[in-house]
């Protein structure tokens, strides 16, 4: 199945009017509306941005995926139907130093690679999952006790370059670091629907009010 097409066509998590995403003005981050959720992330130099939805914060590959559309303001956007509070999501980005290749797949692929960093400082790497800088909540830290004790991985996976990564005490087969897919392990952004109850504004007559500093 082609990258970016693994998602429902109707109902929960289905795209809502994708033909309008390029001209939309959704604010940055994930915004929960009445029946839909909008996603928006800024990148001037990215050439493709993939939104991924996860069922668990750690240990699983992405469940759904969507290509975001770039607006004239260099903000990449999408709108999905009925994305519930607490949903985990993240992004993968391609850029001038690592353009999208039809052969690229999740799971330690180097397809499309040109350089770890180019003359303009671009360091795009689709194998390194990115959380939303405007997320209201993250699922976990870059390195957790569970990651180390149960899965024998550490934060060394997030690096790039030609050397090899093989986990803690070389428990895993060595993989060129730039190609190691951090998707199952990286921190995920969390969709948060603000349900904060601010209460009812007190109505106190002026003669009974007190000013406190």
PLM regions and their residue ranges:
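Beta-strand signatures of extracellular beta-sandwich domains
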Residues: 50-52, 90
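Catalytic cores of carbohydrate-active enzymes across secretory and cytosolic contexts
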Residues: 15, 60, 64
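The feature marks proteins involved in alpha-glucan
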Residues: 2-34, 73-75, 82-213
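Structural beta-strand segments of beta-rich domains
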Residues: 35-39
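Short, surface-exposed loop motifs enriched in S/T, G, D/E and P with embedded aromatic residues
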Residues: 64-71, 78
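Short proline/glycine-enriched turn/loop motifs at strand-loop junctions of beta-rich domains
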Residues: 42-48, 83
